[in-house]
């Protein structure tokens, strides 16, 4: 044994730490750690008791300072220093055991004991670090508030309702995310994105609350899924609304109305789609008498007398147009021309010697001409209608800017100009044959303007109004069509002229003469009065016809699309008007809703929510009526019929 010890010392082994001594050292180290942990737990308990007792009036300040002292003893710097010192001690232990290994002393230390000792030390070090981290999580922290610095102990970090830690309140206000479920398709965005438009459905927290699903913590909308991509992009882009290609226009418009993006966004979207801005609702006069007159002449659907006035106006317009056409017949035209020439003063070269004395002796003048009398009656009605509408209109400036009122003025003025000219010539006498012929030609041109009276029918025709809206919305396409035709006419007229220049019997004597042929060919009419003869001219004609088909076909689909839009919009307005009229005439509608819809000046429902409110009121009234019928057995036959037809009335509404 002594020989082994001596040999160990001589070989450089550290013989003062055999295997038994190393085990005793590890046991003492564990004991020391257990004592230190117990002391730390006692200190924590004392600090907790001090904090809880700090609320008392007597010893509040003492416990407060004591707790603060405890807090300062466990600041982050001291904890980091203790961890550093403990790590250094662990490294020293490892180095000590490496030096005290006995590679040549097999009798004192078993084989493999060195690796086992180092592994146990590493495990103890990891356990100590984990315990230190847990203790650090449970240490004291400072929270600053209005009352100063306070120290409290907790095992968890301070939490708030947003779950964001110390600064979670501000973080949740600006970066809180929201989930929107649209028919099973989930979208995720931030609250601040939706808050850019607080007047919309998604931007107003109160409006979107009714769609919130607390179980899944999301907002659910049973709406069109492809449309919501554009709706969400409206919030993300700051107000840009673009319809997806795979969504029809009417469906996307309904979605925009549902999410309450606003009238301005809807109007801008329609302008981007190529539609004109819709006319604003025409206001009614404030004066009650003017209001009734305005409704009588402007809104035929407002009452039965208004409908009767509209029928009379249409009949007068038709009579005026028929008279305008009949007076051009040969059997009426000769006599009327003679009367017009006679009233122009003198009959020099305009009347022959046999017809003039006959007309003068018979007393036949323009004032007793049957056509003139009928024309006068029509003009009296037109003038009366125009003056009354001008008197009762809400705004004189807007009244004279309306195209229909301008047409009324243009259709009335020729009569008074003709009448004034006739009276002036009769009083002044004849001033020469040339002046009389000039006056006669001017009167004919003025009388031609009466043909614009046919446009007065558009006031009472929905189809003509739709056509007018379509043409106004398609002005850009129509201008493009005319521009293409103009280029084609110039190009092919020049080409056919030079192609037919060497032909003596050609119809194209000049380029302007070929304009007519180019227009007729490009519009695929082909009268045949002018046609090319040479081979080159026929080739030019073929190309002209093909180019005309392509030129006309390009803008036509856009015009047809505009017509379909205005037609469907008018059809929907008529359906909503019918629903409103049925609702107002329904005997089961509550009195408050009935008064609301009767007081409405619009002929259609502006929002579906109003119709849903009306439908809900009808259902409540029907339920009350059914309960009344079931509770009373001796009701009259009328009440029984009303109760039995309750479902039918509900279906109609």
Swiss-Prot record:
Q: How does it sit in the membrane?
A: Multi-pass membrane protein
Tissue-wise expression:
Expressed in brain, and at lower levels in the testis, lung, kidney, colon and heart. Detected in heart ventricle.
What InterPro entries does the entry give? BTB/POZ_dom (IPR000210), Ion_trans_dom (IPR005821), K_chnl_volt-dep_Kv (IPR003968), K_chnl_volt-dep_Kv1 (IPR003972), K_chnl_volt-dep_Kv1.4 (IPR020467), K_chnl_volt-dep_Kv1.4_TID (IPR012897), K_chnl_volt-dep_Kv1.4_TID_sf (IPR037065), SKP1/BTB/POZ_sf (IPR011333)
Q: How does its activity get regulated? A: Inhibited by 4-aminopyridine (4-AP), but not by tetraethylammonium (TEA) and charybdotoxin (CTX).
Gene Ontology molecular function terms on file: delayed rectifier potassium channel activity; potassium ion binding; voltage-gated monoatomic ion channel activity involved in regulation of presynaptic membrane potential; voltage-gated potassium channel activity
Positions of region (Disordered): 24-148, 629-653
Q: Which residues cross the membrane?
A: 305-326, 371-392, 404-424, 440-460, 476-497, 539-567
Signal peptide region: none
Cellular component aspect of the GO annotation: axon; axon initial segment; dendritic spine; membrane; plasma membrane; voltage-gated potassium channel complex
Phosphoserine PTM positions? 90, 122, 599
Residue span of motif PDZ-binding: 651-653
Compartments reported by the entry? Cell membrane; Cell projection, Axon
Residue ranges, compositional bias (Basic and acidic residues): 629-640
- Taxonomically, the superkingdom here is Eukaryota
Give the residue ranges of motif Selectivity filter: 524-529
Tell me which stretches of the chain form a coiled coil: none
The annotated subunit structure for this chain is:
Homotetramer and heterotetramer of potassium channel proteins. Interacts with KCNAB1 and KCNAB2. Interacts with DLG1, DLG2 and DLG4 via their PDZ domains. Interacts with SIGMAR1. Detected in a complex with KCNA1. Interacts with KCNA2. Part of a complex containing KCNA1, KCNAB1 and LGI1. Interacts (via cytoplasmic N-terminal domain) with KCNRG.
Its protein name is: Potassium voltage-gated channel subfamily A member 4
């Amino acid at each position: 044994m002594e020989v082994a010890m001596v040999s160990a010392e001589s070989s450089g082994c550290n013989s003062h730490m055999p295997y038994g001594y190393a085990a005793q050292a590890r046991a003492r180290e564990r004991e020391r750690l257990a004592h230190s942990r117990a002391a730390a737990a006692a200190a924590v308990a004392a600090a907790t008791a001090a904090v809880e007792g700090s609320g008392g009036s007597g010893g509040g300040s003492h416990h407060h300072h004591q707790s603060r002292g405890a807090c300062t003893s466990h600041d982050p710097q001291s904890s980091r220093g203790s961890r550093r010192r403990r790590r250094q001690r662990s490294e020293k232990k490892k180095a000590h055991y490496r030096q005290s290994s006995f590679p040549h002393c097999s009798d004192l230390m078993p084989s493999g004991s060195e690796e086992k000792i180092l592994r146990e030390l590493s495990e103890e070090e990891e356990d100590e670090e984990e315990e230190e981290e847990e203790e650090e999580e449970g240490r004291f922290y400072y929270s600053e508030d209005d009352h100063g610095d306070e120290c409290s102990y907790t095992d968890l970090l301070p939490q708030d309702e947003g779950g964001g830690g110390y600064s979670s309140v501000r973080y949740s206000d600006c970066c809180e995310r929201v989930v929107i479920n649209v028919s099973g398709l989930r979208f995720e965005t931030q609250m601040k994105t939706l808050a850019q438009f607080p007047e919309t459905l998604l931007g107003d927290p109160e409006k979107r609350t009714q769609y919130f699903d607390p179980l899944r913590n999301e907002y659910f909308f049973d709406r069109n899924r492809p449309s919501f991509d554009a709706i969400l992009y409206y919030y993300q882009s700051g107000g840009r609304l673009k319809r997806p290609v795979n969504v029809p226009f009417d469906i996307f418009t309904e979605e925009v109305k549902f999410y309450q993006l606003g009238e301005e966004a809807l109007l801008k979207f329609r302008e981007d789609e190529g539609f004109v801005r819709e006319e604003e609702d025409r206001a009614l006069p404030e004066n009650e008498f003017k209001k009734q007159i305005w409704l009588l002449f402007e809104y035929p659907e407002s009452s039965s007398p208004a409908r009767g006035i509209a029928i009379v106006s249409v009949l007068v317009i038709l009579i005026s147009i028929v008279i305008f056409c009949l007076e051009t017949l040969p059997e009426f035209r000769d006599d009327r021309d003679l009367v017009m020439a006679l009233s122009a003063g003198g009959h020099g070269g305009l009347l022959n010697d046999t017809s003039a004395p006959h007309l003068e002796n018979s007393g036949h003048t323009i004032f007793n001409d049957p056509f003139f009398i009928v024309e006068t009656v029509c003009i009296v009605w037109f003038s009366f209608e125009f003056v009354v509408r001008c008197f009762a209109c809400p705004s004189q400036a807007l009244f004279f800017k309306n195209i229909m009122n301008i047409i009324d003025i243009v259709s009335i003025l020729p009569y008074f100009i003709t009448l004034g000219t006739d009276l002036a010539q009769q009083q002044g006498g004849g001033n020469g044959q040339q002046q009389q012929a000039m006056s006669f030609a001017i009167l004919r041109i003025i009388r031609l303007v009466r043909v614009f009276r046919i446009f007065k029918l558009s006031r009472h025709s929905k189809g003509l109004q739709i056509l007018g809206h379509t043409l106004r919305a398609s002005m850009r396409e129509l201008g493009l069509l005319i521009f293409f035709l103009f280029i084609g006419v110039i190009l092919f007229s020049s080409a056919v002229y030079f192609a037919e220049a060497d032909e003596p019997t050609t119809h194209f004597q000049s380029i302007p003469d070929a304009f007519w042929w180019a227009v007729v060919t490009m519009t695929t009419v082909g009268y045949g009065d002018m046609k090319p003869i040479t081979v080159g001219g026929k080739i030019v004609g073929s190309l002209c016809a093909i180019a005309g088909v392509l030129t006309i076909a390009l803008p036509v689909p856009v015009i047809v699309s505009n017509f379909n839009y205005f037609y469907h919009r008018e059809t929907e307005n008529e359906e909503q008007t019918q629903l409103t009229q049925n609702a107002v005439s329904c005997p089961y509608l509550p009195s408050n809703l009935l008064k609301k819809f009767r007081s409405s000046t619009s002929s259609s429902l502006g929002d579906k929510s109003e119709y849903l409110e009306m439908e809900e009121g009808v259902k409540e009234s029907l339920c009350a009526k059914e309960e009344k019928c079931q509770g009373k057995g001796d009701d009259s036959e009328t009440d029984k019929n009303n109760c039995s037809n309750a479902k039918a009335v509900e279906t109609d509404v």
